[in-house]
């Protein structure tokens, strides 16, 4: 349990640093064999890339480091509940587990509201 707290603390530290410097308040770490192998923080505004969320940045780094798209055997710790895009990337990369500190409701309170996406998903394509 102590390691899980350490990994989450690192994700939160990345989110704080990101909010104070280059982007939104989101950070993530990917862990394999009880070691951090990749880190990511929100770089949407600094890179002009709307997909550069902390989770996606960490996934890209881990895939590059391990030279594979399959992150089975790895876990992700993230400062906030993943948005639909990040959750999809987590599933596609086959990460074993997700741990998050804040909920999407917490994110909504600080103007990071993705509830409109969740409302769109169940709609028929013609109604989107």
Give the positions of each predicted feature:
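Short, basic/aromatic recognition patches
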Residues: 1-21
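Active-site phosphate/pyrophosphate-handling residues
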Residues: 6, 35, 57
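Small-residue (primarily alanine) positions within well-ordered alpha-helices
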Residues: 11, 15-18, 28, 38, ...
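Exposed boundary/loop context
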Residues: 17-20, 33, 47, 101
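Short, basic and Ser/Thr-rich N-terminal targeting/leader segments
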Residues: 22-26, 72
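Short beta-strand scaffold segments in enzyme catalytic cores
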Residues: 26-34
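Zn2+-dependent cytidine deaminase-like catalytic core
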Residues: 38-128
């Amino acid at each position: 349990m102590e390691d899980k707290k350490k990994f989450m603390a690192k994700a939160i530290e990345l989110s704080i640093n990101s909010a104070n410097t280059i982007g939104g308040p989101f950070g993530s770490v990917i862990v394999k064999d009880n070691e951090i192998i990749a880190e990511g923080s929100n770089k949407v505004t600094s890179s002009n890339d709307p997909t550069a969320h902390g989770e996606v940045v960490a996934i890209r780094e881990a895939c590059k480091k391990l030279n594979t798209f399959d992150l089975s055997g790895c876990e992700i710790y993230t400062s906030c509940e993943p948005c639909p895009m990040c959750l999809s990337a987590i599933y596609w990369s086959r990460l074993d587990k997700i741990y998050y500190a804040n909920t999407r409701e917490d994110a909504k309170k600080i103007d990071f509201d993705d509830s409109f996406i969740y409302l769109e998903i169940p709609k028929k394509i013609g109604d989107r």
